[in-house]
């Protein structure tokens, strides 16, 4: 749906998936790493959608992505799929370190200055991994407990091992102050309470808005600047496309998106958190 909005509004976009469901790391990669480097071993990042293609190719890409999801949901389906998009763990913490390079390339390729980074997840990240070397062999270790420091050039950041994802996002907001960062977290009522408490560092979270609307937003100062908690059941029905002419003005796109989401409890959330960022 976000891609549809970007296409109608003429906003460039790139969509990536990431998993550690399979590993194609070649041995020559280890010749380039140093001890204590953040590890990308086994992390598979796949570029699945982009605005830098014509309409026919873009729609075929979305169709292929749908086939992938259908196959993963219904294993008996005869739909074609790619094992590179197979489900696995969630190496979010490690993958976040690749975001600055992605955004740099995105700015160059699309000649843009303002960028919004939206990370959609449905679970917590696996522990952060880093490389170690022993007897000229490279190993992967997981950060578990104790103090962890991240060095980026001349800057050193302290990472909280109990709130690792939040610490990494805080590092990203400092490194990329002009980039809007949002986390869309798909979860049910119970998961929304747990996730909100963890990110707000509080013992209480009022779930009434989430239950009423199927979504809620929270803001933090020491992690994700904006978190959109969304119940995936919200997207069970609705029209399949945003009805607006290509190249329409922002007001028409906003109205069309509102109509598209009419009857969906997440409409207020998405309009407030995403459209305002893109405008």
Model-derived segments and their meaning:
Residues 1-279:
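Acidic, glycine-rich A-domain
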């Amino acid at each position: 749906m976000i891609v549809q909005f970007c296409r109608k509004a003429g906003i460039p976009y790139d969509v990536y998936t990431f998993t550690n469901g399979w590993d194609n790391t070649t041995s020559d990669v280890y010749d380039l790493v140093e001890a204590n480097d953040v590890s990308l071993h086994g992390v598979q990042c796949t570029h699945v959608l982009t605005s830098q293609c014509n309409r026919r190719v873009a729609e075929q890409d979305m169709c292929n992505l749908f086939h992938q999801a259908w196959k993963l949901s219904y294993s008996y389906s005869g739909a074609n799929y790619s094992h590179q998009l197979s489900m696995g763990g969630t190496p979010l913490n490690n993958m976040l370190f690749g975001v600055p390079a992605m955004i740099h390339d995105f700015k160059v390729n699309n000649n843009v200055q303002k960028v919004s980074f939206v990370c959609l997840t449905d679970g917590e990240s696996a522990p952060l991994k880093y490389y170690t070397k022993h007897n000229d062999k490279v190993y992967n270790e997981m950060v578990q407990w104790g103090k962890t420091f991240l060095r980026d050039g001349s800057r050193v950041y302290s990472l909280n091992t109990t709130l690792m994802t939040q610490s990494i996002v805080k590092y990203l907001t400092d490194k990329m102050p002009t980039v809007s960062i949002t986390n869309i977290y798909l979860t049910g009522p119970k998961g929304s309470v747990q996730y909100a408490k963890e990110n707000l560092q509080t013992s209480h979270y009022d779930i009434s808005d989430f239950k009423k609307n199927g979504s809620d937003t929270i803001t933090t100062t020491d992690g994700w600047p904006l978190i959109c908690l969304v119940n995936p059941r919200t997207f069970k029905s609705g029209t399949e496309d945003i009805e607006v002419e290509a190249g329409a003005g922002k007001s028409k796109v906003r109205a069309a998106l509102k109509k598209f989401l009419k009857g969906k409890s997440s409409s207020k959330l998405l309009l407030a958190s995403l459209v305002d960022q893109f405008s």
